[in-house]
């Protein structure tokens, strides 16, 4: 469960809310005066929050939990607050906000900073840093990190234990690399990035040419001469891999969010603020537009162009361009196995049934 602040560090609700990043948010309290405001030590779900925690309601399916939650305060939409007032419901201080999920996110950021301090700057004695590497002020380099020739680490960046920063690579200011992140040579990460453990950026793209001089069916390697460029405010999940370009660079735009275990092949371009869920595979030279969302385990073929504002449902196989914004789904619905077998048998006969139907129409 989330870590609670020590009792002596608990904050009055209005003081806590005044201390968060309120950009783009407008909120007010339902409590009549400051004397009624609880002191807050943490944040939790409606079902798990205690009487010293704040919670939130952003999904209507959990609205019935408002009646049973022990939370000291709950973030709700204006409609929910009005409905509770009309019903005469009481018992909780309400934080009324048009965007409760975003306000919850800002509170979670505050509690993370309060409960998980970054630790002091400095280079661990076991780290190996090439003399030509540049490390700006307030950088923290963890145990057994390797920073190769010509690499640069920007101000305030933090490298967890065992990270490898290849020759000529750059890590932007205030970025966080969790333990065992690997940046090959020529990988450039922007500011305020978060890269989770096991991620590998800049490995060779999958490039081979048929070469009969090496033997029947043999393949000759095509050196991958491009780089990887990651924008600002990007998050990359654990064990995600982003290959370097063959000639042009592989590019991840500003604000992109990549979940765990995603494969981004060489020369792919991902537009700003696109979010991609776990286990997605993106084949080489595909371009994905801005503000797209791609559901988990989807597969995108190579050399495709995906428009801006496209939403791809989980498990979809995309094999052709998508030129228009909207939601796209290519998933065969699950069913009981016996029913699925019957439906699959019918699908296998569709071409035959189509021919027979056309023959009947001609009669």
Swiss-Prot record:
Please list the GO biological process terms of this entry: lipid A biosynthetic process
Catalytic activities: a UDP-3-O-[(3R)-3-hydroxyacyl]-alpha-D-glucosamine + a (3R)-hydroxyacyl-[ACP] = a UDP-2-N,3-O-bis[(3R)-3-hydroxyacyl]-alpha-D-glucosamine + holo-[ACP] + H(+)
In the Enzyme Commission scheme, what number(s) does this protein have?
2.3.1.191
Q: What does this protein do?
A: Catalyzes the N-acylation of UDP-3-O-acylglucosamine using 3-hydroxyacyl-ACP as the acyl donor. Is involved in the biosynthesis of lipid A, a phosphorylated glycolipid that anchors the lipopolysaccharide to the outer membrane of the cell.
Q: What do we know about how this protein assembles, alone or with others? A: Homotrimer.
One GO CC term, this protein:
membrane
Q: Which CDD domains match?
A: LbH_LpxD
* Catalytic site: 266
Q: In which pathway does it act?
A: Bacterial outer membrane biogenesis; LPS lipid A biosynthesis
Instruction: Give the similarity note.
Output: Belongs to the transferase hexapeptide repeat family. LpxD subfamily.
How is this protein named in the record? UDP-3-O-acylglucosamine N-acyltransferase
What species is this protein from? Bordetella pertussis (strain Tohama I / ATCC BAA-589 / NCTC 13251)
Q: Which residues form a coiled coil?
A: none
Classification via NCBIfam families: lipid_A_lpxD, PRK00892.1
Q: Name one GO molecular function term.
A: N-acyltransferase activity
Q: Which keywords describe this protein according to UniProt?
A: Acyltransferase, Lipid A biosynthesis, Lipid biosynthesis, Lipid metabolism, Repeat, Transferase
């Amino acid at each position: 469960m989330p870590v609670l602040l020590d009792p002596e560090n608990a904050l009055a609700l209005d003081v806590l809310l005044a201390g968060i990043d309120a950009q783009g948010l407008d909120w007010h309290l339902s409590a009549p005066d400051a004397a009624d405001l609880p002191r807050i030590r943490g944040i939790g779900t409606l079902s798990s929050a205690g009487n010293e925690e704040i919670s939130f309601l952003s999904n209507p399916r959990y609205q019935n939990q408002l009646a049973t939650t022990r939370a000291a305060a709950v973030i709700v939409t204006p409609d929910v607050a009005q409905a509770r007032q009309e019903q005469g419901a009481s018992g909780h201080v309400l934080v009324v906000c048009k965007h409760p999920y975003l306000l919850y996110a800002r509170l979670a950021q505050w509690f993370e900073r309060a409960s998980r301090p970054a630790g002091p700057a400095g280079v661990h004695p076991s780290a190996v840093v090439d003399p030509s590497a540049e490390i700006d002020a307030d950088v923290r380099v963890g145990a057994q990190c390797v920073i190769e020739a010509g690499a640069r680490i920007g101000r305030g960046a933090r490298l967890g234990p065992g990270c490898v920063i290849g020759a000529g690579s750059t890590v932007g200011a205030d970025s966080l690399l969790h333990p065992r992140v690997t940046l090959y040579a020529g990988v450039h990460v922007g500011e305020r990035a978060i890269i989770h453990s096991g991620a590998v950026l800049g490995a060779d793209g999958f490039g081979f040419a048929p070469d009969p001089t090496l033997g029947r069916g043999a393949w000759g390697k095509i050196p991958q001469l491009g780089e990887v460029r990651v924008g600002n405010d990007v998050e990359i999940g654990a064990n995600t891999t982003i290959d370097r370009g063959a000639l042009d660079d592989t590019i991840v735009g500003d604000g992109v969010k990549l979940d765990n275990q995603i494969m981004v092949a060489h020369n792919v371009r991902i537009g700003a603020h696109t979010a991609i869920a776990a286990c997605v595979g993106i084949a080489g030279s595909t371009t994905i537009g801005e503000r797209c969302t791609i559901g988990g385990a989807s597969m995108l073929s190579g050399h495709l162009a995906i428009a801006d504002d496209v939403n791809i449902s989980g498990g979809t196989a995309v094999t052709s361009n998508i030129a228009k914004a909207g939601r796209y789904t290519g998933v065969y619905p699950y069913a009981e196995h016996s029913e699925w077998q019957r439906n699959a048998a019918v699908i296998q006969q569709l071409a035959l049934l189509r021919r027979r139907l056309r023959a009947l129409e001609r009669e």
